[in-house]
């Protein structure tokens, strides 16, 4: 095997009360990564969404950091060329950096037949997230690897729970810049216990709703975060207006990851109405998609 081509999905993390725990893999948008064996070194090339803003230096690129660590750990002597076709806009709140991290970990596992488990791939992938967010975290890379709905319940040791689900979502991507680091820094270091009780209860209710295929309950609890969303809402102009306008058209709405992307669980009969509101307020791209698989191989040479 000389070359592998991998599809790595966009993801939505947090989902309201599940901060740094919950994640969903999306069928679109997605990145395509091609990893090819070379004689030596790691070369990175990028095309697609905001490609000119993505560093190709190995130690500054999320995929590069992951690849370097894996190649060191497994004493891989050959070089590689990583080509990333970005379909996920960086800084969107849809797991753009995570797609690169997970995609390259998955590709190297295939290319060099490392036989790593999905959990081990999540662990390696999360290391690259430190470049984008300042610290390793797995709430995006876990669904990018596992697909479906994931819960990262522990970091030391790393534990990920996976639930296959069939949910349609409607995502808006406002043309607003939100820094992941800034969005994390503005969060409170301590919260009242009543807020903890609310979020734990709502997060538990969301898992219950998934097992009972109850979209109404899932969406209602997704919209009830009282810790993270209130802090980040002001970073997204128009969010309060949109939330009010779509409240009767969706089962739930919240900020995707750090934002600015907004994820909704739409009532099917109102999808077009919601899209029109998104475009009226933000004039932005909209994705009507569903929860999808994790990384998968498209081609092998």
Swiss-Prot record:
Which InterPro entries does the entry mention?
GHMP_kinase_C_dom, GHMP_kinase_C_sf, GHMP_kinase_N_dom, GHMP_knse_ATP-bd_CS, Homoserine_kinase, Ribosomal_Su5_D2-typ_SF, Ribsml_uS5_D2-typ_fold_subgr
Q: In which pathway does it act?
A: Amino-acid biosynthesis; L-threonine biosynthesis; L-threonine from L-aspartate: step 4/5
Task: Provide the species name.
Answer: Methanococcus maripaludis (strain C5 / ATCC BAA-1333)
Identify a single GO molecular function assigned to this protein: ATP binding
Q: What does the similarity note say?
A: Belongs to the GHMP kinase family. Homoserine kinase subfamily.
User: Gene Ontology terms, cellular component aspect?
Assistant: cytoplasm
UniProt record, GO biological process: threonine biosynthetic process
What is the top-level taxon of the source organism?
Answer: Archaea
Documented EC number(s): 2.7.1.39
Record's subcellular location: Cytoplasm
Under which name does UniProt file this protein?
A: Homoserine kinase
* Binding-site residues, ATP: 89-99
**Role of this protein:** Catalyzes the ATP-dependent phosphorylation of L-homoserine to L-homoserine phosphate.
Q: Which reaction does it catalyse?
A: L-homoserine + ATP = O-phospho-L-homoserine + ADP + H(+)
> Which Pfam family, any one of them, does this sequence belong to?
GHMP_kinases_N
Give the record's keywords alphabetically.
Answer: Amino-acid biosynthesis, ATP-binding, Cytoplasm, Kinase, Nucleotide-binding, Threonine biosynthesis, Transferase
């Amino acid at each position: 095997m000389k070359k592998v081509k991998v599809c790595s999905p966009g993801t939505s993390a947090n989902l309201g009360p599940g901060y740094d725990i919950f994640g969903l893999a999306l069928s679109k948008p997605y990145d395509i990564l091609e990893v090819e064996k070379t004689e030596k070194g790691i070369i990175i090339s990028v095309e697609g969404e905001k490609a000119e803003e993505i560093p190709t230096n190995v130690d500054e690129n999320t995929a590069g950091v992951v690849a370097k660590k894996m190649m060191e750990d497994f004493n891989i002597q050959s070089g590689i060329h990583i080509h990333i076709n970005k379909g996920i806009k960086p800084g969107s709140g849809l797991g753009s950096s995570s797609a690169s991290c997970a995609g390259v970990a998955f590709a190297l596992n295939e290319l060099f037949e490392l036989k790593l488990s999905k959990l081990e791939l999540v662990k390696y992938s999360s290391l690259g997230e430190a470049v984008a967010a300042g610290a390793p975290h797995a709430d995006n890379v876990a669904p990018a690897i596992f697909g479906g709905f994931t819960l990262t319940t522990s970091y030391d040791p790393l534990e990920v729970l996976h639930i296959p689900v069939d949910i349609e979502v409607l995502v808006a991507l406002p043309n607003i810049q939100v820094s992941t680091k800034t969005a994390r820094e503005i969060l409170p270091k301590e919260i009242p216990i009543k807020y903890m009780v609310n979020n734990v209860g709502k997060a538990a209710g969301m898992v219950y709703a998934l097992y009972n295929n109850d979209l109404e309950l899932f969406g209602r609890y997704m919209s009830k975060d009282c810790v993270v969303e209130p802090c980040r809402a002001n970073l997204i102009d128009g969010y309060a207006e949109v939330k009010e306008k779509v409240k009767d058209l969706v089962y739930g709405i919240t900020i995707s990851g750090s934002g600015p992307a907004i994820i909704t669980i739409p009532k099917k009969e109102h999808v077009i109405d919601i899209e029109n509101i998104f475009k009226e307020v933000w004039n932005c791209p909209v994705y009507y998609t569903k929860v999808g698989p994790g990384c998968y191989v498209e081609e092998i040479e």
